[in-house]
Amino acid sequence: MATNLRKTHPMMKIINNLVIDLPSPSNISAWWNFGSLLATCLALQIITGIFLAMHYSPDISMAFSSIAHITRDVQYGWLIRNMHANGASLFFMCIYLHIGRGIYYGSYLYKETWNTGIILLLLVMATAFVGYVLPWGQMSFWGATVITNLLSAIPYIGNTLVQWIWGGFSVDNATLTRFFTFHFLLPFAITGLTAVHLLFLHETGSNNPTGLNSNTDKIPFHPYFSYKDLLGLILMLTFLLTLTLFSPYLLGDPDNFTPANPLSTPPHIKPEWYFLFAYAILRSIPNKLGGVLALLFSILILFLMPTLHTSKQRTASFRPLTQILFWSLVADLLVLTWIGGQPVEDPFIIIGQVASTFYFLILLLLMPAAGMIENKMLNLK
């Protein structure tokens, strides 16, 4: 009998166990598609990014012009650039939906997978931030100045640290060069950590919408979920191409069409839409250090999710109180995103403060309390 190369070859055996013969729960829904979509986003960003790096000049006198050159003169440069910029937005849409799925269905109880996932989120956020500085427009420059300047709130070493990151006394050529270096380097670190993330996931297997052990009811990944993922992939790429070809600058900031000018501050400094919720939390605290800590904790709070899980049931599928709180959290994050893009004036200040308080209240207090109440109601000791 001929041996199956797919199952015996050292290299193909790994791929086989990863995407072909992988035992998967039979009832996982479309919410489980986002892992493969994120991998696709990452591949797309690396490919388009490498082509952009071929034509980009990381120098303050040429950066803005080189972006204009890519858009105007390079073959399909406009497409590559717009796919890269909007691909980042799509990356964050997928990552937030992926995390939301994890919170709703209790996937965070796979602690190693969850923790590597949060580190991946932090790396993706860092990559997006340094990448936003590269076009050297007004919002790039002032965004970099404001966000890096937050580190000066750290007692004793703050100012030294900021100057060390800047490579001088202000955001300048040295800053742009190092940000380009990190923007090129980090996606490869993300790729490596993604492999670790998958390694930990495949130690336990996927969770499912019921939260019950699915070992008695597994099906092979291929053809069932490979085709299901392919459908999600086609829908995602259709959305990306529609956005890129019809409204490429919809999610960008008009200020970035103006070259960076250290002598002129834009009226409203704000980051890209995917950071607005964290920016709103930062601004809602009148104290600089307090704001920075709130900003940090708004992401790092995710590390506490397994500890804060009090329910005897894993998912929120059969827990109405937790469902109400989860969707309240989603609504709260949408409010924070809206507030982050508004000027610092009434009534936006108080709305931001209330929404920020609710964000931490839901995650730290109300969700654990709801879990305990539901246990009591169901007589689960």
Curated annotation (Swiss-Prot):
SUPFAM superfamilies: a domain/subunit of cytochrome bc1 complex (Ubiquinol-cytochrome c reductase), Transmembrane di-heme cytochromes. GO terms for cellular component: mitochondrial inner membrane; respiratory chain complex III. Heme b b566 binds at H98, H197. Its main location: mitochondrion. It is a multi-pass membrane protein. Its cofactor is heme b. It is found in: Mitochondrion inner membrane. It comes from the Eukaryota. Binds 2 heme b groups non-covalently. GO terms for molecular function: metal ion binding; ubiquinol-cytochrome-c reductase activity. Belongs to the cytochrome b family. The cytochrome bc1 complex contains 3 respiratory subunits (MT-CYB, CYC1 and UQCRFS1), 2 core proteins (UQCRC1 and UQCRC2) and probably 6 low-molecular weight proteins. Component of the ubiquinol-cytochrome c reductase complex (complex III or cytochrome b-c1 complex) that is part of the mitochondrial respiratory chain. The b-c1 complex mediates electron transfer from ubiquinol to cytochrome c. Contributes to the generation of a proton gradient across the mitochondrial membrane that is then used for ATP synthesis. Heme 1 (or BL or b562) is low-potential and absorbs at about 562 nm, and heme 2 (or BH or b566) is high-potential and absorbs at about 566 nm. This is Cytochrome b. It comes from Chelonia mydas (Green sea-turtle).
